[in-house]
Amino acid sequence: MKNTIYMAPMEGLTDFTFRNAYEKIFGKGKIAKYFTPFISPNKSEKFLAREIRDIDREHNNGINTVAQVMTNDAKDFIWTARMLYDEYGYNEINLNAGCPSGTVVSKNKGSGMLNEPKLLDKFLDAVFEDDFIRENIKVSVKTRVGVETDTAFPEIIDIYNKYPLEELIVHPRLRTDFYKNDLNLEAYDYAVKNSRSKVVFNGDIFTRKNFLDIKKKFPQTDTFMLGRGLIADPGLIDVIVSENPEDFSRDLISDKKRMKELHDLVFDARLHIMPGDTHAIHRMKEMWCYMAYVFDDCKKEIKAIKKSQKVADYKSAVDIFFNVAKLTEKDYILFSKKF
């Protein structure tokens, strides 16, 4: 069974600069869908400039991009979907019912939608009652399994089952877990066995071993969404889509070279579009929060990247890093998000 891979939406990380660079250097048709970081509809019924820049088809040429929307207002979802379809050519929209951010959840958005399943049901009912949505838009959902407990997850699955979702992407954690604690694989198993929609696995696939362990537990799952794992180790895609992921032999020297190419493409693009060098460097350091974990022999070089504030200093530190550091394939990675 061939595995299908999606790239997860990650705010500040998987914007169009990263998506395009990744597809050129590593993806090469291996990523079935790239999901945009969420669009948050506002009452003006207009997209922000940065949202337009990210969804613009000229910035997503040659890749299959799915726009993610975060709202708990069906009317806002519908006008956003209509505009995405009419003006930008998107026919698949993903609802964010998974973001654990406190500012999001306090507004009953993201994973906060799971707090009141009846309101989630009301939202989806209104969305699918709309003629335009039914006729033109494929709607998928990215969900968690609950807010503080998973006791309502069967009810949540029952609600999702009432509607013709394109697919259900399950991150098997509670909102209160954020991105820590063990995955709730029992809840994911429940989704696999009870969902009427196609179920996609999302969560903690950072290494080959992570992937093989999940695949062994859920052999019927053939579609996986990866985010942090592809930021940290872009070459992991070659392993997962291979005919035999367990025995696939990687060329880590080549992968390190390609990582440098990816980094440089993203950095150059961000320098071009962002207001000021400092902003672009800060964004790149967010990537290093993950990339640093797959290298050995590089503590001093990583420290120099952290300290750099100017473009010349940053580029010099990065060049030295890639000359010295050794790319390794680890069994487990525990991200601390500190850089």
Question: Residue ranges of each PLM-predicted region?
Answer:
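Flavin-dependent oxidoreductase catalytic cores
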Residues: 1-339
